[in-house]
Design a protein with these regions (language model features):
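C-terminal motif of bacterial Sec signal peptides marking the signal peptidase cleavage site
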Residues: 19-22
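Bacterial signal peptide processing site
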Residues: 24-27
Length: 196
């Protein structure tokens, strides 16, 4: 019986240490690395970086603002507000005009918008756990969209190693506020890269 208690104690201690290390920010006052376009190189060879392009569209900024508002609702564990903002994001995505982009960019943007719209619709109809599952994929879509449209704002790609094997999202603030765990683990994550 004593051996079982010691084993359970050791397992609990190991789990606590893993959780603590995994969620540690790791930021030692080092500035975030500037993000160039490496992660989109295979699809965006004609782009030098994610800075604002000639194809900048005000509606792309509206989509970003809706995304950030949705992120903030998830950070605040506000299911009702997230539903409302998911619906608002659906409308912004549907009104996005791709006509000023090259044929290749139009094709990519149409795919991104279709996928992002589906996830925003799920968010507008779901409980918070399901909203967060769809926000993970929505975040990838929005990041891919920014690689094409550019942005006027400085953005931070943040990363939580704990949620679903590791998950990234975009933020306007360098300070990490985790939309996947909300108040449960608000500060879990780190700035992975700086955009623009």
């Amino acid at each position: 019986m004593k051996t079982v208690k010691r084993t359970i104690g050791k397992i609990a201690l190991a789990a606590t240490m893993v959780l603590t290390v995994s969620c540690k920010d790791g930021n030692k006052n080092e500035p975030a690395a500037h993000m160039s376009n490496e992660m989109h190189q295979e699809t965006m060879d004609d782009k030098d970086d994610m800075a604002m392009s000639d194809n900048q569209d005000a509606k792309a900024e509206a989509i970003l603002n809706d995304y950030f508002n949705l992120k903030d609702a998830l950070v605040g564990d506000d299911n009702g507000k997230a539903k409302e903002l998911g619906n608002k994001l659906v409308q912004s995505l549907k009104s996005f005009d791709v006509s000023n982009y090259s044929d290749n960019e139009k094709s990519e943007l149409n795919d991104i918008i279709e996928d992002a719209t589906e996830h925003a619709e799920h968010i507008s109809e779901s409980d918070i756990k399901h909203q967060r599952e769809h926000f993970k994929i929505l975040s990838k879509d929005v990041t891919d969209m920014v690689a094409i449209t550019g942005t006027q704002a400085k953005l931070y790609e943040q990363f939580c190693p704990m949620y679903d094997g590791g998950t990234a999202w975009l933020s306007k603030e360098e300070n990490v506020l985790n939309p996947y765990y909300g108040s449960q683990m608000l500060r879990c994550g780190k700035v992975q890269r700086e955009i623009n």
